[in-house]
């Protein structure tokens, strides 16, 4: 139970911190475990997704373009992310490293 509790509280703090670092505009790359690629309209390129590129819990979803650009390599998930770094939902194939 102790381990589960610490994981839960860690997930909660990541979720709450995501909104404070949500949008950096174009040209920003946070590496493979990016937790705030495209939150809000048009940040990081021309995407209009909300929450794309996943976070450390691998559960982010995107509604529309994620992380801008067309034909990138980091946004191939379909709603549930992939493993520890999750890659977000359906975006427009944008790359996290705009």
Curated annotation (Swiss-Prot):
The processes (GO biological process) annotated in the record are:
sorocarp development
Xref: InterPro entries: HssA/B-related
Task: Map out region (Disordered) in residue numbers.
Answer: 1-26, 60-98
Mark out the compositionally biased spans (Gly residues): 60-72, 89-98
Biased composition, Basic residues: where in the chain? 73-88
The text of the family note is: Belongs to the hssA/B family.
Protein name (record): HssA/B-like protein 34
Its lineage opens with: Eukaryota, Amoebozoa, Evosea, Eumycetozoa, Dictyostelia
């Amino acid at each position: 139970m102790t381990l589960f509790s610490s994981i839960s509280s860690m997930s909660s703090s990541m979720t709450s911190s995501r909104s404070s670092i949500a949008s950096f505009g174009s040209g920003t790359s946070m590496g493979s475990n990016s937790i705030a690629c495209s939150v809000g309209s048009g940040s990081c390129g021309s995407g209009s997704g909300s929450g794309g590129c996943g976070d450390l819990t691998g559960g982010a979803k995107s509604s529309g373009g994620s992380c801008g650009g067309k034909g990138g390599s980091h946004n191939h998930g379909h709603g549930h992310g992939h493993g520890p770094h999750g890659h977000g939902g359906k975006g427009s194939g944008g790359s996290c490293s705009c």
